[in-house]
């Protein structure tokens, strides 16, 4: 299940697609208000619902415990999501070179996984409250990718070192990655929106 909202502006070579990836317990509508706050008039929205159910809550991949991922399922779901985006790009005539993932929590983690495993699918990414999902056996070259990490200094779910580890990995593989620390926990705040808008304005 997914939601697609075409761009409100004129479709041209600069048109973007925002791939919205919700957190645990969310659905395909959760991040649409967030996308609207970013004020990008030439962006279409593609928002899939996670297919894994944990205690009645949708997620994008299984986990064994808090912060401990089922890596085999993560790999499978990463490729499944990448294949979905590829198929949707044909269905909706989207430019695969202009797809920006905007992920929160579990959605940010699978967005990072797509960057690391199927980098051809995404041009850039905004990751809210992420951690390292996996380290692939073969590291990609992400020198053409731009990534914003927005993390909470008081996040009870993602420790600061886990965020820093992801930053270091993305930097190691060449991504143009920046990190913004918010005076918050795991929840999103207005400061996250300000940071994301500013980052997007520089693309």
Question: What kind of region is each of these model predictions?
Answer:
Residues 1-94:
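Serine-hydrolase catalytic machinery in alpha/beta-hydrolase-like enzymes
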Residues 31-34, 159-169:
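Short alpha-helix in the alpha/beta-hydrolase fold that links the catalytic acid
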Residues 33, 113-117:
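Active-site signature of alpha/beta-hydrolase-fold catalytic machinery across serine-
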Residues 93-103:
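Alpha/beta-hydrolase fold nucleophile elbow
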Residues 103-107, 111:
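Gly/Ala-rich beta-loop-alpha elbow adjacent to hydrolase catalytic centers
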Residues 120-132:
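A conserved short beta-strand
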Residues 148-151, 155:
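Short beta-strand/loop motif that positions the catalytic acidic residue
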Residues 164-167, 171-203:
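C-terminal catalytic histidine-bearing segment of alpha/beta-hydrolase fold enzymes
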